[in-house]
């Protein structure tokens, strides 16, 4: 992390200007845009432009320049077959790349045009296999530069040759570290921190953008957020990508309001930006901010109604309005534009779940996992779907995968605990509920699950301890039925143990609920009778108004289970 601060910002800007030129010449439009936005963030950094432009103009000049100029115009107009045809005999790295890349994009375009509801099998793509064979031949002959290696890695990845693809993409990152597309393709192949740390990556400042991206992908939120803060301090504090990644990191830390404010800042800086606005729409959906989501959908449609992000935003808008048919239509539209669009597959699965179309949900979630195996939402969705289908063993497997990806998300841990409980794996369920308490119970149900399970097991001391912790935050616990049951249980528990002050306190609480009001009256009568007997036998009259039994609880040294056991202090050791 420390070496981030030592970067020569002028050198960074020079690298950006050179890379923008190189990527633009090769038709790598998304990377060109990404680099240009980074460069714009450094617009106040002054350079000797004569040196920079002279360096850029020293590109190779060859007899293929006229062919390149013609082919590049065809490429820019998406006439990929024509571009590939006219460059077939070219051998210089730049024009050769344009030929191979045109063939690749032609195949991708035709695949999308011919796509049905079932995505095509990449292993049956003869054009892709032929392209990969040509790239392999060039690679063996040492003819591939950093950009050619990138394309070779992409084709290997498409053909599911994962290990070879990883090696080739790492090689590409050494030869051309400024190509962001290479880093993103490599990121999709990394499944855990161990694999990330085993890679031999170039010692280049772009590596830090990649590492920050990977930290978020691997749910290493604190490291990722710290690195993005460092990048902002380098001069990228207004860069839309860095801000969006920061918002995503903040969202992962469950600070949705702060994440929304960060996206509002991005819109203020760049009002026509649609990049990452699908993520923003997800946050508005979670917070049920209908007006803001409607405004975002309207604005996105006006900017570009056929953008992936727009389709996703409008789909979320209709989903929030419970118009699931229209939501499905827009998510399908997004997938028609890009079958690898992860967010749309996951959201489509959610919509099918709402429509009780379990087959559609399973297919969508599986496709999301094919695109990115780290998408915990898809694993979690599959767990829910198989639960509905009364297939608990499948559900348990998918919940385990979701929990491994999000080990500190109480929702994943709770779902796993419930799955264990349904299969009578009680000790595993208890561990999960304790874990959910320890990591911060988002939904506020872990304690009640723990208490209820202990009550079923007849472990009354443990149950009372959990119920005691549960009722201490009664304003958070909105479910009146659960709260009233907890108060009734604690009343009966303390009554059996002749702890009349506490029993009286909880019985008074029971009077506030219609469900327990009558029972509370009966319990209070029992408490009064017991008190009378105590007074008769001991002839001691206590002034009940002097102390509040609950406030005074900490000062007493009795056997109250809340003092013996706190679920929040136990550790979690999952069963393999």
Regions found by a protein language model. Name each.
Residues 63, 92-94, 145, 179, ...:
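Residue-level recognition of tetratricopeptide repeat
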Residues 75, 104, 157, 216, ...:
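Position-specific recognition of the canonical hydrophobic site in helix A of tetratricopeptide repeat
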Residues 140, 173-174, 233, 265-268, ...:
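Conserved structural position within tetratricopeptide repeats
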């Amino acid at each position: 992390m420390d070496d981030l601060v030592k970067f020569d910002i002028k050198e960074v800007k020079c690298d950006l200007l050179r890379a923008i030129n190189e990527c633009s010449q090769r038709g790598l439009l998304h990377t060109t845009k990404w680099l240009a936005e980074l460069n714009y963030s450094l617009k106040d950094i002054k350079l000797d432009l004569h040196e920079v432009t002279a360096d850029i103009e020293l590109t190779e000049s060859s007899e293929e320049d006229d062919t390149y100029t013609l082919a590049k115009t065809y490429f820019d107009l998406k006439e990929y077959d024509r571009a590939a045809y006219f460059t077939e005999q070219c051998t210089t790295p730049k024009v050769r790349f344009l030929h191979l890349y045109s063939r690749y994009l032609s195949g991708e375009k035709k695949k999308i045009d011919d796509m049905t509801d079932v995505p095509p099998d990449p292993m049956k793509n003869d054009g892709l296999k032929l392209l990969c064979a040509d790239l392999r031949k060039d690679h063996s002959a040492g003819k591939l530069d950093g950009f050619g290696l990138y394309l070779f890695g992409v084709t290997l990845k498409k053909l599911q040759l994962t290990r070879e693809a990883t090696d080739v993409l790492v090689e590409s990152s050494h030869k051309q570290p400024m190509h962001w597309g290479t880093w993103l393709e490599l990121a999709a192949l990394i499944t855990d921190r161990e694999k990330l740390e085993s890679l031999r990556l170039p010692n280049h400042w772009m590596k830090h953008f990649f590492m920050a991206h990977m930290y978020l992908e691997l749910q290493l939120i604190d490291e990722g957020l710290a690195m993005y803060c460092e990048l902002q301090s380098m001069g990228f504090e207004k860069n839309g990508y860095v801000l969006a990644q920061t918002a995503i990191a903040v969202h992962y830390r469950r600070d949705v309001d702060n994440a929304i404010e960060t996206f509002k800042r991005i819109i203020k800086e760049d009002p026509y930006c649609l990049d990452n606005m699908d993520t923003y729409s997800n946050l508005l959906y979670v917070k049920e901010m209908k007006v803001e989501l409607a405004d975002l959908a309207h604005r996105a449609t006006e900017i570009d109604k056929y953008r992936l992000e727009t389709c996703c935003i409008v789909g979320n808008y209709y989903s929030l309005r419970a118009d699931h048919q229209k939501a499905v239509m827009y998510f399908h539209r997004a997938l028609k534009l890009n079958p690898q669009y992860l967010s749309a597959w996951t959201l489509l699965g959610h919509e099918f779940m709402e429509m009780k179309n379990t087959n559609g949900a399973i297919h969508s979630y599986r496709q999301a996992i094919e695109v990115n195996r780290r998408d915990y939402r898809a694993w979690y969705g599959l767990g829910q779907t198989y639960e509905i289908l009364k297939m608990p063993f499948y559900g348990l497997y998918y919940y385990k995968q979701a929990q491994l990806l999000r080990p500190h998300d109480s929702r994943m841990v709770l779902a796993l605990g419930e799955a264990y409980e349904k299969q009578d794996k009680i000790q595993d369920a208890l561990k999960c509920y304790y874990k959910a308490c320890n990591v911060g119970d988002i939904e506020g149900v872990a304690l009640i699950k723990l208490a209820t399970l202990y009550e079923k097991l007849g472990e009354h001391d443990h149950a009372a301890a959990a119920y005691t912790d549960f009722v201490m935050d009664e304003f958070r616990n909105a479910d009146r039925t659960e709260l009233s049951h907890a108060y009734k249980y604690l009343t009966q528990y303390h009554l059996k143990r002749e702890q009349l002050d506490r029993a009286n306190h909880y019985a008074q609480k029971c009077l506030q609920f219609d469900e327990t009001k009558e029972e509370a009256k009966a319990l209070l009568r029992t408490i009064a009778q017991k008190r009378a007997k105590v007074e008769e036998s001991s002839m001691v009259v206590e002034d009940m108004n002097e102390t509040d039994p609950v406030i005074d609880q900490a000062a007493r040294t009795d056997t109250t289970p809340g003092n013996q056991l706190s679920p929040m202090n136990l550790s979690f050791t999952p069963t393999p």
